[in-house]
UniProtKB/Swiss-Prot annotation:
Residues 872-888 have a biased composition (Basic and acidic residues). Gene3D superfamilies: 2.30.29.240, C2 domain, EF-hand, Phosphatidylinositol (PI) phosphodiesterase, Phospholipase C beta, distal C-terminal domain. Its cofactor is Ca(2+). Residues 312-463 form the PI-PLC X-box domain. Pfam families: C2 (PF00168), PH_14 (PF17787), PI-PLC-X (PF00388), PI-PLC-Y (PF00387), PLC-beta_C (PF08703), PLCB1-4-like_EFh (PF22631). It comes from Homo sapiens (Human). This is 1-phosphatidylinositol 4,5-bisphosphate phosphodiesterase beta-2. Residues 460-533, 859-888, 943-979 are annotated as: Disordered. The active site is at 327, 374.
């Protein structure tokens, strides 16, 4: 048990660090070099240096971010300092003596402390050992007693010239309430004047603890103490303390055999350690003050300390881990303006990040050095080489596991890309992975190597060429011009990408998919996508040198989940903006999770986040996305959660996903609101009791408690009331616990506890994964916004975690856990109920004969626990409800939403048909007007035909003539006939084109309508089906409750009847036990049967629901088929319809010709003789032609 045996021990400070070493501290700004003695205090809390004037400067170990030596340390720039250190002499050994300590409150605001030792290689030893203290898990996650001890150590180190502790230092250390500090000093019989001083010998640790108890009394702990100590005695025995530890400080879910409860002899060691009175300790007694320090000790850490260490299996494929990832790593401020810095790569990697981004752009002449910057913005540039050197220096200081360099490559120069590749090879050396591992070839179906396989390696993520043909850009200076496209490989000379055959075909498929997808987007959507993606969509082609460095992380454009599953290439990765990823997650969450089981995805902020703000990473962790990249320079809530979560597992930057999110045979829906298979949900209860030293001012404060997890988790945020007074030293909140009833997947959830000042000013917070929390009373030491531990502020809380149990099963669980206690309580309730109701109605006890035989000493078993009784309970439970039914297809089609949509669609189609008919009529009218202008054969000028009276006729007559429409004066009948035929042909062609366009438009609109209607029906069907499943479960729960009530009534009746049969108390107790045991068996059987019934009904209902959904899909196919058949039929009859319309038009325009010249010799074939003579003649001429 960790309470008795802490997993982690405090860091040990090497003797030479505490003894000190002589250095020269220099500063480039002041050009001052001063001799100092550099030391670390024996407990490893502070790095400090003393000047010759005895002046002392402190650096909290928790504020140190890095230590550097040799060529990576800072170098003096001023000539004055360079002369002091003889740096310009050829045999100078300056690099062997350098030491730089980097500190700061966050990754951007940094201070560099520069030292030079008198001896060689001293700086290296100091850099390594000080950094080891900084990276120790307990440095940032120490117990409350450790942080309080830090205050004492600092007070005793900050002495005046007389070697005493100035009282003013107490006022500076505890500034919230000066009067309370003075009163606490007086209570310890110490001077309290501002100009007074205290002898360090008069202020040992016991006096310091008494001072703290006076300054910050703990009445809330006294209340806990009085509830467990011996009555009327001011101490707690070791037996009482053992009971307290086992009941309150121990996780009730632990197995008693694997994790045995504490014993009194083990607890004695805790009393010896924390009880201030030696006499009490010898007697095995703990005082209230000892209880306070016990609850502040490392044994009561709120964290499960083993979770801080590397405890995950690191031999799984790379895509089975969440990977700490950064976006636009080089930026120190916003995305549009601000400084870029290579130092950010160091700081991000030191924080445990394992994926950094490099936006590479072409360098300018004459040097043509590639640069890193945010393209098309006002951010500054840094050299690519400088960034690579920073990465090489800090790559594996925090974690030995692989680093991924995510290149956004805009360098369109083969020469500069070759230079980039050369820098990577020479600076990274053996750290760079240039070839795939033998066990993990780049083939479909082969998983990625594990973090352990890639330990100490750097992987490149950059576009990879489809073919790697021979290039000479890096060798031939007179070769290819910059900005030109890469040379295409001659047929038969190129090598297929990643050793796969048919890749060219696959790439063509991808391109076709992309073209098809982009073809469906309008201009505004394309612009929006480009603004969301930023410059990521403008990457250039990779040339051979850079392409050859890419292996296991090959980026490609995402097509679809089905396409990725078909290709099954684990080494292919796709990047998504947060908006695109959210869209995919909301539409196909299960497929997204399955995709991440097979290969990797990277999510990055949308391009419109110009202030470098972040999105919440939790939603994408829920989908199993590995690289959820954030802006590390912005310490907002998403970044705070990211830093807190990746602090665990040895700060390795890799967190193994839950088994359910890795197994291909399991499906996981992150939006599930029900139980997740093989995962036990957790109920978390947190009581915020009090706070200590929350602010440097006297203010009112409140606490927020928030849960990050799956969308289906319970209420996410609670808040206490404001503290009753402006007391920030020890406020107490007397409120009910905050309960998160059903945390579906505890491994994915985190708890945030934040303290805010009145006016919503942030004071401190802590974010801890649910599975890293310990149950019991704990002091929660707060952290800053940048996740740095705060020395003073803390909260005292009570945490209780247990397995989630549905309300319907709560009584049964209690009964099974402790049946005697449960039924005793029920008997007490029954007696009280009987007294209140005036006694239960008397009923004959049905089992009198067996009971009598038992009283007389017979051994025949009673029927209470007989199989017959249990069978009766089963039969009662077997009374199945009516066959579960689901909404039919007809009912779904009659739903209001579907009917309303159908009416809208019908209206749209009617309007479309009207527009088509109007266009058709306009064409006929225009054709008729042109024909009318020709007039009868042999007559020129205006025609004799009127198509309609009034405005319509005027409008038609005012239509513009075509040059060929009118007959020339004196033109003969043959000329007019030729022009009639020409106009007729043109009109037919226009009508055919109009008809085809109209029918195609109608078809597309019908297909769209079908898709919308089916989508609506599917949506409503799923809503209905979810409601049906919920109703089925509720009905089952109600039936179970009713059955339990009936069985409870039967149990009470049996007990009542038994008391009338016998007065022998021993026999009554025995029979009562048997009745209770029988009752428990019956309840178990009933619940088991009811559960089976529910599962059976649920299975039947789901089958029916699935069949209904399949009917909807079939209906979609049928509708599409009908629409297509109608389209084909109308297209088939279009030509005849056009000819008929044109003939009707000709008849209308030349009625006189049809009447006056029927006797004229017909030149047409016999089959056309019955037609209008003029039309027949025109048709005949057309057929001859």
């Amino acid at each position: 048990m960790s309470l008795l045996n802490p997993v982690l021990l405090p860091p040990k400070v090497k003797a030479y660090l505490s003894q000190g070493e002589r250095f020269i501290k220099w500063d480039d700004e002041t050009t001052v070099a001063s001799p100092v003695i550099l030391r670390v205090d024996p407990k490893g809390y502070y790095l400090y240096w003393t000047y010759q004037s005895k002046e002392m400067e402190f650096l909290d170990i928790t504020s140190i971010r890095d230590t550097r030596f040799g060529k990576f340390a800072k170098m003096p720039k001023s000539q004055k300092l360079r002369d002091v250190f003889n740096m310009d002499f050829p045999d100078n050994s300056f690099l062997l003596k350098t030491l730089t300590v980097v500190s700061g409150p966050d990754m951007v605001d940094l201070t560099f402390h520069n030292f030079v030792s008198y001896k060689e290689n001293v700086g290296k030893a100091w850099a390594e050992d000080v950094l080891a203290l900084v990276k120790h898990p307990l440095t940032a996650n120490a117990s409350r007693s450790t942080f309080l001890d830090k205050i004492l150590v600092k007070l005793k180190m900050q002495l005046n010239s007389e070697g005493k502790i100035p009282v003013k230092n107490f006022f500076q250390m505890f500034p919230a309430d000066r009067k309370r500090v003075e009163a606490a000093l007086s209570a310890c019989h110490l001077p309290k004047g501002k100009n007074d001083a205290i002898n360090p010998e008069d202020f040992p640790e016991p006096v310091y603890k008494s001072f703290l108890m006076s300054l910050c009394p703990r009445p809330e702990i006294d209340e806990i103490f009085t509830s467990y100590h011996a009555k009327a005695k001011p101490y707690m025995t070791k037996e009482h303390l053992t009971k307290f530890i086992n009941q309150k400080q121990r996780d009730s879910r632990l197995n008693s055999l694997l994790f045995p409860p504490a014993r009194p002899d083990q607890v004695q060691g805790l009393i010896d350690k924390y009880e201030p009175s030696g006499i009490n300790a010898q007697r095995g007694q703990l005082s209230p003050e000892g209880m306070v320090w016990f609850l502040c000790g490392p044994e009561n850490s709120v964290l499960a300390q083993d979770k801080l260490l590397l405890h995950h299996d690191m031999t799984q494929p790379l895509n089975h881990y969440f990977i700490n990832s950064s976006h636009n790593t080089y930026l120190t401020a916003g995305q549009f303006s601000g400084l870029s810095s290579a130092e950010m790569y160091r700081q991000v990697l030191l924080s445990g990040c394992r994926c950094v981004e490099l936006d590479c752009w072409k360098g300018k002449p004459p040097d043509e050095e590639p640069i890193i910057t945010h393209g098309f913005t006002m951010t500054t540039d840094i050299f690519f080489k400088e960034a690579i050197e920073a990465i090489a220096e800090s790559a594996f200081k925090t974690s030995p596991y692989p680093i991924i360099l995510s290149f956004e490559n805009h360098v369109d120069s083969p020469r500069q890309q070759a230079k980039m590749a050369e820098y990577c090879r020479t600076i990274f050396g053996d750290m760079l992975l240039t070839e795939p591992l033998e066990k993990f070839p780049l083939k479909p179906g082969v998983p990625l190597p594990s973090p352990e396989d890639l330990r100490g390696k750097i992987l490149i993520k950059n576009k990879k060429n489809q073919f790697s043909g021979p290039t000479s850009s890096s060798k031939d200076t007179g070769g290819e011009a910059e900005g030109s496209s890469p040379p295409s490989a001659p047929a038969g000379e190129g090598t297929v990408w990643a050793g796969e055959e048919g890749t060219e075909l696959e790439e063509e498929e991808v391109e076709e998919e992309e073209e098809e997808e982009s073809g469906n987007l309008d201009e505004e959507e394309i612009k929006k996508m480009q603004s969301d993606e930023g410059t990521a969509g403008l990457e250039v082609t990779a040339y051979e040198e850079m392409s050859s460095l890419v292996n296991y992380i090959q980026p490609t454009k995402f097509v679809s989940f089905e396409f990725s599953a078909q290709k099954n290439r684990s080494y292919v990765i796709s990047s998504f903006t947060e908006l695109k990823a959210y869209d995919l997650l909301s539409k196909a969450s299960v497929q997204f999770v399955d995709y991440n089981k097979r290969q990797m995805s990277r999510i990055y902020p949308k391009g419109t986040r110009m202030d470098s703000s972040n999105y919440m990473p939790q939603m994408f962790w829920n989908a199993g996305c590995q690289m959820v990249a954030l802006n590390f320079q912005t310490m907002d809530l998403p970044m705070q959660q990211n830093m807190a979560v990746f602090e665990f597992n040895g700060q390795s930057g890799y967190l193994l996903k839950h088994e359910f999110m890795r197994r291909p045979d399991k499906q996981f829906n992150p939006f599930s609101v029900d139980r997740i298979d093989v995962v036990v949900a957790t109920t978390l209860s947190i009581t915020v009791i009090s706070g200590q030293f929350l602010s440097e001012r006297s203010v009112r404060t409140y606490v927020e408690v928030e849960l990050f997890g799956l969308p289906g988790d319970p209420k996410r945020r609670y808040r206490t009331k404001l503290s009753p007074s402006t007391n920030s030293i020890n406020p107490v909140w007397k409120e009910e616990p905050f309960v998160f009833e059903k945390i579906l997947m505890p491994e994915l959830a985190s708890l945030r506890v934040a303290v805010m000042e009145e006016g919503n000013k942030f004071l401190g917070h802590r974010i801890i994964p649910i599975n890293a929390l310990n149950s019991g009373y704990h002091h929660l030491c707060l952290h800053s916004e940048s996740n740095m531990p705060l020395t003073m502020p803390a909260l005292f809380i009570f945490l209780e975690m247990k397995d989630y149990i549905p309300g319907a099963w709560a009584d049964l669980t209690v009964a099974l856990a402790n049946p005697i206690k449960f039924f005793s309580a029920h008997d007490t309730k029954s007696v009280k109920l009987k007294e209140a109701m005036g006694g239960l109605p008397e009923k004959p006890f049905p089992l009198a004969s067996p009971v009598a035989s038992q009283v007389n000493g017979a051994l025949a078993p009673t029927s209470n626990g007989s199989p017959a009784a249990r069978a009766g309970a089963r039969e009662e439970a077997m009374k199945e409800a009516a066959e579960p039914r689901t909404a039919s297809l007809e009912e779904l089609r009659e739903l209001k939403g579907v009917v309303k949509l159908q009416r809208r669609h019908e209206k749209e189609l009617r309007e479309l048909e009207r527009r088509g008919a109007r266009r058709w009529e306009e064409l006929l009218q225009r054709g008729a007007a042109q024909l009318a202008e020709l007039g009868p054969p042999g007559v020129g000028g205006v025609g004799a035909c009127k198509l309609g009276p009034g405005k319509g006729s005027r409008k038609k007559r005012s239509l513009p003539r075509e040059e060929s429409a009118g007959a020339a004066p004196g033109e003969g009948p043959e000329g007019v006939d030729g022009r009639v035929r020409e106009l007729k042909d043109r009109l037919e062609l226009e009508l055919l084109r109009q008809g085809e366009e109209q029918y195609e438009c109608v078809l597309k609109r019908k297909e769209q309508h079908v898709a919308e209607q089916i989508s609506k029906m599917m949506e409503l069907a799923r809503e209905k089906q979810a409601a049906e499943l919920k109703a089925l479960k509720e009905t089952s729960e109600n039936d179970t409750k009713e059955m339990k009530k009936k069985l409870e009534t039967k149990r009470l009746e049996r007990i009542q009847g038994m008391t009338k049969v016998t007065t022998d108390k021993m026999a009554q107790e025995r029979l009562k036990r048997e009745i209770n045991n029988s009752h428990i068996q019956e309840v178990v059987q009933v619940i088991k049967q009811m559960t089976e019934n529910l599962e059976r009904h649920q299975e039947k209902l789901e089958e029916k629901q699935a069949a209904c959904l399949e009917q909807i899909r079939e209906m979609e196919k049928q509708f599409q088929k009908e629409a297509l058949a109608e389209y084909e039929a109308r297209m088939k009859g279009l030509e005849a319809e056009v000819k008929e319309s044109v003939r009707a038009c000709l008849r209308t325009c030349f009625p006189s010709e049809a009447k006056d010249k029927p006797e004229r010799a017909c030149e047409c074939p016999p089959e056309l003789c019955e037609q209008d003579p003029l039309i027949a003649k025109a048709d005949a001429q057309e057929s001859r032609l």
